[in-house]
Amino acid sequence: IGEEANIQDGVIIHSHGGATVTIGARTSVAHGVAVHGPCAIGEDCFLAMRSSLYSATLANSIWVGMGALIMRATLDSHTYVPAGSVIRSRPDAWGMRFVSNKEKRYMEEIREAVNRLREDYMKSRAVANA
């Protein structure tokens, strides 16, 4: 799990038989996401609530919408996967649009909010242990 990655409540990450799951730096994995390895998730990605990955590879800066399912597919950088999409192979993702500037800003806002929460937690912990 990369630096400043954000893994939220109720996320399930697992794999079988020694397969690996990697999550890149600054990637946000929202509530209730399921990741079934082997999976490789790049840097600066956003996986919205209840999305699922199964044996998938995501390049950098990908947005996966709520409830989307990606299985046995490789997605290129900056791909936007709409909520509820089902991607069963690479061709299913062809023609999808790129992540917009608005979505990029949202991902950055999430990253900043999570960093503030972490910093506040560390400060309160230091005070409690003093």
What positions do the PLM features span?
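A positional/architectural concept
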Residues: 1-7, 11-15
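Short proline/glycine- and basic residue-enriched helix-capping loop/turn segments at helix->loop/beta transitions
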Residues: 28
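Glycine-rich hexapeptide-repeat left-handed beta-helix
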Residues: 9, 16-21, 31-32, 37-130
